[in-house]
Amino acid sequence: MGRIVGIDLGTTNSVIGVLEAGRPFVIANAEGSRTTPSVIGYTKESELVVGQQARRQLVLNPKNTFSNLKRYVGRSWDELEENSLNVAYTIRANNQGCVRVTCPITEREYAPEELIGSIIRKLIDDAEKYLSETIDSAVITVPAYFNDSQRQATKDAALLAGVRVERILNEPTAAALAYGFDKSSSSRVLVFDLGGGTFDISLLRISNGVFDVKATSGDTQLGGNDFDQKIVEWLANDFKKEHNIDLRRDRQSLQRLNEVAEKAKQELSGLNSTPISLPFIATGPNGPLHIETKLDRKTFESLCKDLIDRLLQPVEVALQDSGWTADDINDVVLVGGGTRMPMVQQLVKTIVPVTPSQSVNPDEVVAIGAAVQAGILTGELRDLLLNDVTPLSLGLETIGGLMKVLIPRNTPIPVRQADVFSTSEANQSSVEINVWQGERQLASDNKSLGKFRLSGIPPAPRGVPQVQVAFDIDANGMLQVSATDRTTGRKQSVSINGGSNLNEDEVNNLIEEAKDKADVDRRKRASIDQRNNALTLVAQAERRLRDVSLEFGPYGAERQQRAVEVSLRDVQDFLDSDDLAELDLAVSSLQEALFGLNRRISAEKRTDNNPIQGIKNTFGSLKDELFSDDYWDDDPWDYHPNNNRVGGGRDYGGRNLDRWDNDFYN
């Protein structure tokens, strides 16, 4: 098996890791950062930008820049909470009730998976550059409380990026792998994972390389962004009260509020108060309006009291499901930037009488764990075993709309569970299997994963036919359902992906489109890299010419300086054109000219300690001036007035300059 990377696909930031020589580490992106903002955007020229480049245009181009997309993956419009709709860009429901993101500049609507695929592609591209090899496989993490639809949608996003998902791994489990993969002692660990958009709790037993997940719980609509929104609401409400202007109705103002709120939240993790300044946030009857205020930690914590209360319930549920008490916990691992908030750390200390571990980086630990899982799959790490669980109960709808659970939550996976059902009417020739996921008693109150029909059942009285329904969950947490008529042996099975925002045809079309775009993107990148390299060389040449003039005067290495100046002008001219081939030739010529200049300067410096060498250099320079190939043919006496080489002219792209032209040295 080839190289497999580990990807933490986060709501706010994403990270990629890899295993090298048995040790996991994080790969920095092309910008040099170990985390990549999970932001995608289109510039005013309709060019796709991802990561930090996209983040920079959040305020100036809010309609075409998209963040926090993970909250929409695999979810229908009806499942979204109101706070998820408070974004500066436009989202809507399509005819099937799926979430679509509107991009005015491209005049297109995108499924969240399609945009998130661009984040995965950037992570893979940056890793390929670092590792100098092609990567097409990954372990991708998801919140432990992601349902089957959200997991399938995550796989779709990777598929659109041209990446095969070898394993879907729960984020808290990944954090536990990173924390305990090199520990030999036994312990009971609580992983408290508060990310940008989701919250997860997992309880694990770690012993001699075996990671046994006992229980998991969480909230996929609660994260650090909700704490930001508390500050946004506080600022917007005060401003509206004072000026009767609702800043949330203006996209640019809303984005500025989001950015300053995130910054204030981060600063209050280390300070007791922080200033908030937003000049020219709006315009009133008497001119521009500004926000100048201060937020202290006590006020911030009072704003977030309801969010802190929401963090408590999943912890209690996980403890109850595991059969453990808080006193049974030996270690606590904090994951996600949200756990840096003092009020969150204080909450954890009130729940579990254990000081949280400081041995892991909350922003990178999940990607490290994903890289460890990749090492397990490739066989590089052989002494580790992971036993995960399914986060939510799975079942089907029975008579009266009740939910019949076949696989309870926190069941170890992979797992297969079957039960026998019958018809509800006499002479019924088919049955419809409705698959649901959740903890409510009525099926309709849970999440519908899909349905299919088993036909060809022989006529019989009600309750006589026997239909066996089997649920299979693989190691990725993906579900397959089958139904078999025991009388005829007729069988119908389906892989559940009804919650995905994209059907199979859409996925295939987008894959082909992504391949086409990938070629175009590679050509664009190559062009940009070529121009950037040329600009770097131009700057080096200009700096070298200045240094030589200051050190040796205008006549030191005069001929070589002139050659550099000519080549330099050629490169600058072709930078303004689209002729990359000529630019490449001009760059090569400038490199040769710089080499000649540097060689001559080195020779000049040697004359300081060797006068005889200085005489040789002088006569050598005179010879070069009189008999250089730029002035004469190979035979110096073969002079002819029409010989173009006499003038030493250069020809790039049809532009001729002669050494006797006044413009030649300008």
Curated annotation (Swiss-Prot):
The keyword Transmembrane does not apply. CDD domains: ASKHA_NBD_HSP70_DnaK-like. Transmembrane segments: none annotated. Keywords: ATP-binding, Chaperone, Nucleotide-binding, Phosphoprotein, Stress response. Induction: By stress conditions e.g. heat shock. Disulfide bonds: none annotated. Gene3D superfamilies: 3.30.420.40, Actin, Chain A, domain 4, Substrate Binding Domain Of DNAk, Chain A, domain 1. The keyword DNA repair does not apply. InterPro entries: ATPase_NBD (IPR043129), Chaperone_DnaK (IPR012725), Heat_shock_70_CS (IPR018181), HSP70_peptide-bd_sf (IPR029047), Hsp_70_fam (IPR013126). GO terms for molecular function: ATP binding; ATP-dependent protein folding chaperone; unfolded protein binding. The modification Phosphothreonine is found at residue 198. Pfam families: HSP70 (PF00012). Belongs to the heat shock protein 70 family. Acts as a chaperone. This is Chaperone protein dnaK1.
